[in-house]
């Protein structure tokens, strides 16, 4: 789901890069209340786990592959702000060391996967917890619902970005 370099024009990538920087700054500020000396190692381990599971790709269709996102899991484990930071670190490492995504698209990917996907999963998770029966399985079920919902929501953000500044030849209706 990483957007590669050259798929979205530079003005659009720059605008969403600025939004990603702003969102990351908010996450940094808010993470101070979510993470302390006791929970900081969990945030780091969560980032490592997300990185590891994202290295496992599975075929989707016609020469493409997918992998787990991890934002919803991180959100449940360490809170939304720390999760956003963990996913941002993972995306940065993947872009810099593995060319997964790309540097000019890093802001787009951070916006979609670290901010939109995590925020969406947080809102869906909180809503699901409120409406599900209060049982042992409510939290894992709410987390699964949140993870499931976060993927099309972040994909919709990409579709909006593609509609604004897509360089590809595919029409937006095909992308969405």
Question: What role is predicted for each listed range?
Answer:
Residues 2-6, 10-16, 20-73:
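Hydrophobic transmembrane alpha-helices
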Residues 14-15, 40-45, 69, 84-88, ...:
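Hydrophobic alpha-helical transmembrane segments
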Residues 15-22, 45, 49-52, 89, ...:
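Lipid-exposed faces of alpha-helical membrane segments in multi-pass integral membrane proteins
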Residues 39-43, 47, 68-69, 115, ...:
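Conserved active-site and cofactor/substrate-binding residues in soluble primary-metabolism enzymes
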Residues 53, 57, 93, 97, ...:
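Alpha-helical membrane-inserting segments
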Residues 54-117:
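Alpha-helical membrane segments and adjacent membrane-interface helices in multi-pass membrane proteins
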Residues 113-158:
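Short helix-perturbing small/polar motifs within transmembrane alpha-helices
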Residues 139-144, 163, 168-176:
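Glycine-rich ThDP/TPP pyrophosphate-binding loop and its adjacent helix/strand module
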């Amino acid at each position: 789901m990483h957007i590669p370099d050259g798929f979205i024009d530079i003005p659009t990538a720059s605008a969403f890069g600025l939004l990603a920087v702003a969102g990351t700054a908010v996450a940094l500020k808010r993470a101070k209340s979510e993470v302390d000396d006791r929970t900081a190692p969990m945030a780091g381990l969560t980032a490592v786990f997300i990185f590891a599971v994202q290295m496992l790709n599975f075929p989707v269709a016609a020469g493409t592959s997918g992998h787990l996102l991890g934002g919803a899991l991180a959100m449940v484990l360490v809170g939304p702000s720390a999760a956003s930071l963990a996913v941002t670190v993972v995306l940065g490492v993947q872009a810099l060391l593995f060319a997964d995504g790309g540097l000019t698209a890093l802001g787009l990917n951070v916006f979609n996967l670290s901010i939109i996907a995590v925020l969406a999963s947080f809102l869906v998770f909180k809503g699901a917890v409120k409406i599900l029966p209060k049982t042992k399985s409510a939290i894992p079920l709410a987390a699964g619902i949140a993870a499931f919902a976060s993927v099309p929501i972040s994909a919709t953000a990409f579709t909006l970005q593609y509609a604004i500044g897509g360089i590809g030849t595919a029409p937006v209706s095909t992308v969405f």
